[in-house]
């Protein structure tokens, strides 16, 4: 029926908008949940990277490295290689060999420090990408939900402004009655009251379809 179908259409539009908002919210929550671990990685890594940019931070980090098992293993391997090379060339007691052995620790320390800064930088990049993804998802969510809320408002306004079925029927009946009465007043037509009644009935039916 024409009148009720308008109300139903507005209600369906509002319902569809509510469901779409629910889906948007669920999707946004899922994106936030998926990106949260990467955000947690980036924050601490940024602090560590900032610490390594200071002399005190570098000194503390290198001190820990020099007292670690990985450093001992790398240093022993480097000394063994240098001593074997010096023995093969007869330069075990040379100044050059001594300088090479003395340079092992600083070289290993600098290589390790550079690697640590690179690793922390990569983790910071992961966190930044996650933050950017969260910001983008949040903006999309706000835009989409805002549009859906506007649709809901328009649908609710249309439903509120649409006359009820009773008022449409009453208006149609009154219009039909007036038309029927006018016809009944014409000579040779159905009498005025009967014409009004029939016209009102036809107007009522017309308003419902």
Curated annotation (Swiss-Prot):
Keywords: Viral genome ejection through host cell envelope, Viral penetration into host cytoplasm, Virus entry into host cell
Function: Component of the phage injection machinery. Required for injection of the phage DNA into the host.
Family recorded in the similarity comment: Belongs to the podoviruses gp7 family.
UniProt protein name: Putative DNA transfer protein p32
Origin superkingdom: Viruses
GO biological process: symbiont entry into host cell
Organism in which the protein naturally occurs: Acyrthosiphon pisum secondary endosymbiont phage 1 (Bacteriophage APSE-1)
């Amino acid at each position: 029926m024409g009148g009720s179908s308008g109300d139903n259409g507005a209600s369906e539009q509002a319902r569809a908008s509510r469901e779409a908002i629910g889906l948007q919210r669920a999707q946004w929550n899922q994106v936030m949940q998926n990106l949260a671990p990467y955000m947690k990685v980036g924050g601490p890594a940024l602090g560590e990277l900032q610490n390594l940019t200071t002399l005190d931070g570098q000194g503390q980090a290198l001190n820990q490295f020099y007292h670690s098992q990985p450093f001992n293993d790398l240093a022993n391997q480097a000394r063994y290689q240098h001593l074997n090379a010096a023995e093969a060339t007869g330069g075990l007691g040379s100044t050059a060999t001594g300088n090479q052995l003395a340079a092992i620790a600083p070289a290993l320390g600098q290589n390790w420090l550079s690697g640590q800064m690179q690793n922390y930088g990569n983790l910071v990049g992961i966190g930044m990408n996650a933050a950017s993804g969260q910001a983008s998802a949040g903006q999309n969510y706000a835009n989409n939900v805002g549009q859906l809320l506007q649709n809901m408002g328009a649908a609710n306004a249309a439903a509120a402004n649409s006359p009820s079925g009773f008022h449409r029927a009453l208006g149609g009946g009154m219009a039909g009655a007036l038309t029927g009465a006018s016809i009944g007043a014409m000579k040779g037509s159905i009498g005025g009251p009967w014409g009004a009644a029939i016209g009102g009935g036809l107007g009522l039916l017309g308003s419902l379809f």
